[in-house]
Amino acid sequence: KDWNYFTFAQQWPIAVCAEHKSCFIPDSVVGWGIHGLWPSSDTESKGPENCNGSWPFDINNVMPLVPELKKYWPNLYPDTKANSFWEHEWSKHGTCATSLPATSNELKYFGMGLKLHAKYNISRILVNQGILPSKTAGYMINETEAAVKRELGVDAVIECVYDKEKTKKQLLYEISICLTKEFELISCNKKEVSETTCPRKEPFFYPPVHDNN
């Protein structure tokens, strides 16, 4: 399957946990975490997946990155194997990116994710625009989309999730940016941008990761 750009998705730990009963956010995780770096196609409904079943994830190949991966690409589900999130992302998406020199193996692929997280840090982008985690303040999707565009110059895809257990509120869940195969920023697909899962007419919430912050 052909693909022509990357989607780089970062997620807010509190909202990830609103979706999953067994969830734990380690003290070392204080901001937006990486969800994944996904080869994507603007002609297909989504990009290629599971491109090489004979290349399983091997933690030994990313050992130098593990301390950073735990902090910035964390698995928040204690009922799963420690490396299962990275295994899943590699098998489903990473194996589809190996044709590019910059992401041709596990070390390069996960290293690129960490590089992009440092360069396009969502916590920093939102803080620069006055959007801060808060127990009480709500934010509107239009303002948030415009804020991200002011920072990056391109349209991002912003997603929310409904927290039916605790707060009964819409929570900011994920922000995805799109990049060329040369890792230059581009606007994401207009259809995906407009079909946000965040409510258009009411605010969503962005609660802090650790209560003491």
From Swiss-Prot:
CDD domains, per database record: RNase_T2_euk
EC number: 3.1.27.-
Annotated family: Belongs to the RNase T2 family.
Pfam families the record matches: Ribonuclease_T2 (PF00445)
Recorded effect of pH on activity: Optimum pH is 5.0.
Compartments reported by the entry: Secreted
Protein name: Ribonuclease Oy
A GO cellular component annotation in the UniProt record: extracellular region
Biological process, per Gene Ontology: RNA catabolic process
Molecular function terms, GO-annotated: ribonuclease T2 activity; RNA binding
Regions that span the bilayer: none
Catalytic residue list: 35, 89, 93
Domain of life: Eukaryota
S-S bonds: 51-96, 160-198, 178-188
Annotated source species: Magallana gigas
Glycosylated residues (UniProt): 52, 121, 142
InterPro entries hit by this protein: Ribonuclease_T2_eukaryotic (IPR033697), RNase_T2-like (IPR001568), RNase_T2-like_sf (IPR036430), RNase_T2_His_AS_1 (IPR018188), RNase_T2_His_AS_2 (IPR033130)
Keywords noted in UniProt: Disulfide bond, Endonuclease, Glycoprotein, Hydrolase, Nuclease, Secreted
Function description: Releases mononucleotides from RNA in the order of 3'-GMP, 3'-AMP and 3'-UMP.
